[in-house]
Every structure is written in structure tokens, then in C-alpha cells.
Regions:
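Extracytoplasmic beta-strand/coil segments of soluble accessory domains associated
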Residues: 73-121
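C-terminal beta-signal and adjacent terminal beta-strands/loops
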Residues: 119-122, 553, 647-656, 682-742
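A beta-strand signature from Gram-negative outer-membrane beta-barrel systems
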Residues: 133-185
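Periplasmic-side early beta-strands and strand-to-turn transitions of outer-membrane beta-barrels
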Residues: 178-303, 554, 650
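Gram-negative outer-membrane beta-barrel transporters
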Residues: 185, 439-445, 547-552, 568-658, ...
Length: 742
């Protein structure tokens, strides 16, 4: 099968390129095609007229010409300021990389679908180092069902509230219409190397009128990615001795994904509509052998290739959108999201944390309810203005039958039972916000905003922001912003019944055993986000540079000092706030209209600093710089070619281990700069059928996982740290996509 996919992809590429090159002297692409190509890095505003420097858009056409395999994060990562990384610098679950915006980590990236938050990853427990065994929340919508993706960075994201300190990814789906439309799409790839998992995906959509004022949309999806071979990293692992001598760091796990979603729209009055939507998704992993500490036991070996965790997600929402002749618009919605995280039993103590201790499944049930209402009012008082007022209420409730079960093996914690602790936790957030877009002159837009959040556990937070867009001469625009962003602690971090135990290895400053306990006295994380950008636009040319700095306060981590010691000498640590951290960098953009049919788009991100001011250690392990370049050629109306190039800079590991000691030996390993080249071709065979074939990583620049970042072990054996070498990068991969629609 893989050879057939390679052959088909190669034939599509050769055939289209063969047609293309003889036509190079006669470029006949339409203006519409040109504008579509130029949308690659169009900077938009977050639901308003403000043109912020930290907003980028990925269009449906770009997704069609560069279809992602596992997850749309593969294409989101090509936006300025975006990378993929783990929840922490530990390297644990190193191949479960998620979207990191401006070095603030995945926990500070808010994922939205059609403007509504997605929270299923919150049903996965936090490990001692802050990791979650999760695939993130960017795979709930099939790529072919996406109209566009907005990536919002910096101060512009603060209006979205909790969890948006790094930025926001808003996945916007294709809508209903007055005419019947349908599609069937399929995607398959074939890695050059047999030890890498392949992907197959198929999905459909159907939309149209139901009669009267009603219309509907329905889509469904099936996809499967095989797990990497259990020994994919053999020969590349860091040194392992004793009982760990025969263990290997795992590759990327596979996944089986099923989605179905239905929406009915009722236009019950002029400029007024109600939408009723329901969706069901099921994601099951195909286990590749990973454990939190890259160790093994008989259950690890037995479960390779099987499902060991299943995430079920049910969503129900009602949305009322309205407008009036005077320009006033309203948006009101209610959403109920019900993720159920079902997984095999895992250890919660020391070296056995995250490794299977049972083949029995236990459930973690998360219930998330959100109510949202906002109104936008245009008016003319001194200057043209557009005032937005809104409110939100969010409740999260969790029943965790899996993670609150660690016995107090190291002795008592006053007030808490060794067994039978409550599996329940919950929190509510009530929010009010106001934003005013003020057109001071034809070239000056000022946007002040204020958001208030009250969290039932951590209390009040105020998030003011101010953004300015100032035209300079005909072609230059100065863009500036400052905002106070906010993130509430998770239900695990605030739950005193969530307790982890270590006999000493996991303890920061203790030689003997220690506990880590949830802390209901935490403060919310905040960040003062600032950016200044200068942009030039003329005749299709776009050039810009943006400086950003996030002064991060009260980041939540496992504690550095014990708060109590019991009569057995066991220290008690809690989740605590780190006083200060800072992230700073530069983003650059250059788009060149080479000709009427050739467009060259580029962006670069350069990180100046990312550190915990208390310890000086790094906040996340991301490249020093990332360059993304795309060359698109619309050969003729029905044929387009594309090359993509990404260059990742050096990646440096943590400076200190989990005990606060400077890293040594292989713990200091860096990832050297490397680059990835991709080629693709798209042919619109008919009005209703298109083919895309391509190859990722043309020069087969592979990267292997060597282990976790830090050394662990004891008298019976040692697993030496791998520094920054904690993930796999796939080699050369051929792919073919068929899209049909009517």
C-alpha cells in the first residue's frame, strides 16, 4: 500500500510539474487566484477593525494545497511566533508536542472552534513536572472542514480571557448556505521509513436548505495514524545502565479518530439567526511504548499498538447572532462540553509515575459549561467608535476516579486520608469585558479595553489593554499594544486531594521522600504583554517587523521548598507561584509578489530570552529562531505548485535539573539547527475534483528522541538525560489528497 501511495503522489507531482514548466512563459492565472495566494500571511483583527501585528490567517486553500497529516498544528506552527513543544522543559511525553505561541507554552495557548473554547485536554492530569499525556485540542475538526484558522498573538489575545496569555488559535469551520453543497475527501501518506507511522483520512460534508428559513450542515470524519515502531529510536538513546539498559525512548504514538458534527440554522427574522449544533468525537491512541520516565515493564511491552487511552468529547451549543439596521450587532451563545478521559491505570509515585499498573480503564469526567453574550454598538461621538460590551460565565466540574488515588505511603498529611479522598473538584469564572475601537483620524485607530474575571478559588483579576494602529505616510503603519493577560490555575493544581509521591528522586531539595499536593491558595498567572510593530504594504509587497516582550508573573510550578515535614521525615511540597519570568523576541514578515502568478511569503521568529527570573532557567525548549518560507506558483487556472521551507535554529536544554543543580553530561545535549523542505502540486481536474500530491522533508532530515531531559535512576540503574533531544522529526514522507465537491 505504501508503495502505491508513493507512486500516486509521485505521478501527480511529475504530471503537474510536467504540465507546468512548458507553460512558464504563459502565466494565465486569474486575479482571484492571485488574491488567494496573497492571503498566506494576511494580518486580520480579532473580531474588530483593529489591524494588530500579532494576527495571522491560514485559509482553506492553503490547507488544501498543504494538507496536514496528523493534526492542523503542523500548519499552524508555520505562523510567526508559533512552535511545537511540550508542556514543560522536562522532555517527558516528549513527542506529545502542542502549540506554543511566543514561548509561553501550550498551557497558555487558548484553542477555539468557531470562537468557543475547547477544554478536553484539561481532563488529563498534570504530572510532577507539569506535563500532560495529551495530544492537545487541535484535532477535533477535520482539516478539510476548516474555512480558516486565525492565530492571534500578544496583546490582541488578552480580550479572550483565561488561558490566552500566549495567544489564541481560532479554528473556523465551513458554514451552511442557501444552496446544496457536499464534499468527500481522502488523504493518505507513505513514510519513506517503515518504522514511522502512516496516516489515512477520509471525511464527508453535506449542507443546504431544509425549507423555509432553515438550513443545515453535517460532516463526519475517520482517520487513523499508525504508531511508530517500538524501536524507532534504537541506537540514538542516551546511555542507560542496570535495569534500564534494555529500555528505549518511545516514538510517536498513533491515533484513531472519529468525528461527527451537525448544525441546524434558523433565520427566524431579518438579520437574526439561531444555530443549534451537536458533535461527538472519539480519539483512541495506538500505544508506542511511551511512559512518563521512559522506563518499561511487562504491561508496557504487552500494550504496544493497542489503545491505552480514549478521549470521548460531546459538545452541544446554541448560538444567537443578530444585527440591526443601525449597525448594532449581538453574539450570544451557550456551550456544554463533556470530555471523558478513559485510560488504563497509571502509577502516581516517583519513577513509576505514568507507567501502567493495570489493564483496567478508569474514567476522568470533565463537564464544561460556558455562557457568552456580547453586543457591538457603533456610534459617532467626537470620533467614529465601535463599543463592544460583553459577559461570560464558565463552570468546570471534574470527577476523577484515576488520579486522586495515591496512598500516603510516606506518612500522614494532616487533614487528608490515605485512601478514599473525594474525586470531585470544580471552579467557576464570571467575566465582564468592554472594548472600544476609536477611529481618531483616517489613519489612527485606538482600542482601549478592560476585562474583569472573578474565579471562585483564586479571586479577582483585572486585564486592561491598549492597542494603537497609526498610519505613517502612504505605505507604512506603526502598530503598538500592551495588555495584562490572565490564566487561572487548573483543577489539578488547586485540588488538595490530588497528591503525588516520590521516594526522593522527584523532590527538589529533599533527600528522602516527598509529596506534591494541590494548593487552593494559588494566585492566577498573569503576563504584561507588549509589542511594537512597523509594517510596509504596497502593490502586493508586505514587510514587517515586530518586537514583543511578555513579563510573566506567578507562573505555577511544583514547589521549590517544602511547606511541612511529617514524623517520618517526608516533606510536603505544593504547587506554587514563581514570582517573575520573561519572554522576549522578534517577528519578521516579508511577502514578495514575484510576478502575477508567483508569490513568495516568509516569516521569521527570533527568541531574545525566555527565562525564570528566580532561577535563570528556560521556560520552554524552542528553537532560537524559526524561518518559514513558501513559494507558490499559480501555473494556470487549474494547476498550482508550492514549495515550503522551514529552518529551525539551535535548541538548548534546561540549565538546571529537578533538584536545582546545574545539568551535566548528556543533560546538556543541544539540538543543532536543521531544515525541512517540502514540495506539493495541486491540480483541479474538473470543477468538482482536485488532486494534491507532495513530499514532506525532501532531503530526509530525521531527528530522533534520546530520552527525557533529566537523568533519573538509583542504585539499580540509571537513565541519563537527553537535554533537548526529546522528540522525533519524521523523515521523507509522500502524500496524496483527493478532494471532491459539488
Amino acid at each position: 500500500m505504501n508503495n502505491r501511495i508513493k507512486s500516486l503522489a509521485l505521478l501527480v507531482n511529475l504530471g503537474i510539474y510536467g504540465v507546468a514548466f512548458p507553460l512558464s512563459a504563459a502565466e494565465t492565472a486569474t486575479d482571484d487566484k492571485n488574491s488567494a495566494a496573497e492571503e498566506t500571511m494576511v494580518v486580520t483583527a480579532a473580531e474588530q477593525n483593529l489591524q494588530a501585528p500579532g494576527v495571522s490567517t491560514i485559509t482553506a486553500d492553503e490547507i488544501r494545497k498543504r494538507p496536514p497529516a496528523r493534526d492542523v498544528s503542523e500548519i499552524i506552527r508555520t505562523m510567526p511566533g508559533v512552535n511545537l513543544t511540550g508542556n514543560s522543559t522536562s522532555g517527558q511525553r516528549g513527542n506529545n508536542r502542542q502549540i506554543d505561541i511566543r514561548g509561553m507554552g501550550p498551557e497558555n495557548t487558548l484553542i477555539l472552534i468557531d470562537g468557543k473554547p475547547v477544554t478536553s485536554r484539561n481532563s488529563v492530569r498534570l504530572g510532577w513536572r507539569g506535563e500532560r499525556d495529551t495530544r492537545g485540542d487541535t484535532s477535533w475538526v477535520p482539516p478539510e472542514m476548516i474555512e480558516r484558522i486565525e492565530v492571534i498573538r500578544g496583546p490582541a489575545a488578552a480580550r479572550y480571557g483565561n488561558g490566552a496569555a500566549g495567544g489564541v488559535v481560532n479554528i473556523i469551520t465551513k458554514k451552511t448556505g442557501d444552496e446544496w453543497h457536499g464534499s468527500w475527501n481522502t488523504y493518505m501518506n507513505a513514510p519513506e521509513h517503515k518504522d514511522e507511522g502512516s496516516t489515512k483520512r477520509t471525511n464527508f460534508s453535506l449542507s443546504g436548505p431544509l425549507g423555509g428559513d432553515f438550513s443545515f450542515r453535517l460532516f463526519g470524519n475517520l482517520d487513523k495514524t499508525q504508531a511508530d515502531a517500538w524501536d524507532i529510536n534504537q541506537g540514538h538513546q542516551s546511555e542507560r545502565t542496570g535495569i534500564y539498559a534494555d529500555t528505549l525512548p518511545a516514538g510517536r504514538e498513533g491515533v484513531k479518530n472519529k468525528n461527527i458534527d451537525g448544525l441546524v440554522r434558523w433565520e427566524f427574522a431579518p438579520m437574526q439567526s439561531l444555530e443549534f449544533e451537536a458533535g461527538y468525537s472519539r480519539q483512541g491512541n495506538l500505544y508506542a511504548g511511551d511512559t512518563q520516565n521512559t522506563n518499561t515493564n511487562d504491561l508496557v511491552k504487552e500494550n504496544y499498538g493497542k489503545e491505552t487511552n480514549r478521549l470521548y468529547r460531546n459538545t452541544y451549543s446554541v448560538t444567537w447572532n443578530g444585527a440591526r439596521d443601525n449597525g448594532v450587532t449581538t453574539s450570544n451563545w451557550a456551550q456544554y462540553e463533556r470530555p471523558r478521559n478513559s485510560r488504563k491505570g497509571e502509577g502516581l509515585a516517583g519513577g513509576t509515575e505514568g507507567i501502567f499498573n493495570s489493564n483496567q480503564f478508569s474514567d476522568i469526567d470533565l463537564s464544561d459549561v460556558m455562557l457568552h453574550s456580547e453586543v457591538s454598538i457603533p456610534f459617532d461621538y467626537l470620533v467614529n467608535q465601535n463599543l463592544t460590551l460583553g459577559s461570560e460565565w464558565n463552570q468546570q466540574r471534574m470527577k476523577d476516579n484515576a488520579s486522586n488515588t495515591q496512598a500516603l505511603s510516606g506518612g500522614e498529611i494532616p487533614g487528608y486520608d490515605s485512601t478514599g479522598r473525594s474525586p470531585y473538584s470544580q471552579a467557576e469564572i464570571f467575566s465582564l469585558f468592554a472594548e472600544n475601537n476609536m477611529e481618531l483620524t483616517d489613519t489612527t485607530m485606538l482600542t482601549p479595553a478592560l476585562r474583569f474575571d472573578h474565579h471562585s478559588i483564586v479571586g479577582n483579576n483585572w486585564s486592561p489593554s491598549l492597542n494603537l494602529s497609526q498610519g505613517l505616510w502612504d505605505d507604512f503603519t506603526l502598530k503598538m499594544g500592551i495588555a495584562r493577560a490572565y490564566k487561572a490555575p487548573s483543577l489539578y493544581q488547586t485540588n488538595p486531594n490530588y497528591i503525588l509521591y516520590s521516594k526522593g528522586q522527584g523532590c527538589y531539595a529533599s533527600k528522602d521522600g516527598c509529596y506534591l499536593q494541590g494548593n487552593d491558595d494559588l494566585k492566577a498567572e498573569t503576563s504584561i504583554n507588549k509589542e511594537i510593530g512597523l509594517e510596509f504594504k504596497r502593490d502586493g509587497w508586505l514587510a514587517g517587523v515586530t518586537w514583543f516582550r511578555n513579563d510573566y508573573r506567578n507562573k505555577i510550578e511544583a514547589g521549590y521548598a517544602p511547606v511541612y515535614q511529617n514524623n517520618k521525615g517526608t516533606d510536603l511540597y505544593q504547587w506554587e507561584n514563581v514570582p517573575k519570568a520573561v519572554v522576549e523576541g522578534l517577528e519578521g514578515t516579508l511577502n514578495v509578489p514575484v510576478s502575477e502568478t508567483v508569490n513568495w511569503t516568509n516569516n521569521i521568529t527570533y527568541m531574545l530570552q525566555s527565562k525564570n527570573k528566580k532561577t535563570g532557567d528556560r521556560l520552554s525548549i524552542i528553537p532560537e529562531y524559526t524561518l518559514n518560507s513558501t513559494l507558490s506558483w499559480q501555473v494556470r487556472d487549474d494547476v498550482s505548485l508550492q514549495s515550503t521551507f522551514t529552518w529551525y535554529g539551535k535548541q538548548e536544554p534546561k540549565k538546571y535539573n529537578y533538584k536545582g543543580q546545574p545539568v551535566t553530561g548528556s543533560e546538556k545535549n543541544e539540538v543543532s539547527p536543521y531544515s525541512i523542505l517540502g514540495l506539493s502540486a495541486t491540480w483541479d481536474v474538473t470543477k468538482y475534483v482536485s488532486l494534491t500530491g507532495g513530499v514532506d522533508n525532501v532531503f530526509d532530515k530525521r531527528h530522533w528522541r534520546a530520552g527525557n531531559a533529566q537523568t533519573t535512576g538509583g542504585a539499580t540503574g540509571t537513565m541519563y538525560g537527553a537535554g533537548a533531544e526529546t522528540y522525533n522529526e519524521s523523515g521523507r514522507t509522500w502524500y496524496l489528497s483527493v478532494n471532491t465537491h459539488f
